[in-house]
Amino acid sequence: MNLASISQSYMSHNENERSIVPYIPPPYHPTAPALAVSASQMETMSLGILNQAMSSSAGASGALKDEKAAFGAVAEALRDPEPIRKIKRQVGIQTLKTLKVELSGMRRKKLILKIIMFICANVTMATSLVGGMSIVDEDIAKHLAFDGKGDWVSKTVHGLNLLCTTMLLAANKISEKVREEIARTKRDIAKRQSYVSAATMSWDGDSVTLLRDVKCGD
């Protein structure tokens, strides 16, 4: 047997071995086709929600104003492209934590102001009552007279009355500003929370699925 016949026999043997190996196709996992949402559908949905946000808010309560702000945030989330939406979502999550901490501090400040106003109001009422009784009752007027031993008592009563009245007015003015800041912060929280929840959802064309998990406020 020559070398050529041996080589040919070896090659045919290898081909037979390779042909015996069965072909195993990769596993197939059937999946439902994804429904693509067109940009026109998103814009139509955004305009519909924006109409709710643009309605008149005259005479509306704080909750209704927060709702309109949430509608505007959802419309903005639907209008933004996907990369911008993801960036805003990440930034909004971090901002929400800071806003909630600030809101807790404002509420504590409001509680302290209420306590100060309560104390000042009671002291003002008491000193005003003593001053009014001194006008009616001559004995009290003698004790609170400016010319005599009751001079320091009268000055103390009138000084406390003036001081507590001033503190009451100042605390009331500061409390109004704090209430406005709380309302504005709650509205900002509602807007960002609505944007984050809207940016997290995936929409398949069904408005019920889209709006089911939207959160508004805390």
Swiss-Prot record:
InterPro entries: Orbi_NS3 (IPR002565). Transmembrane segments: none annotated. Pfam families: Orbi_NS3. It comes from the Viruses. May play a role in the release of virions from infected cells. Belongs to the orbivirus NS3 family. This is Non-structural protein NS3. It comes from African horse sickness virus 8 (AHSV-8).
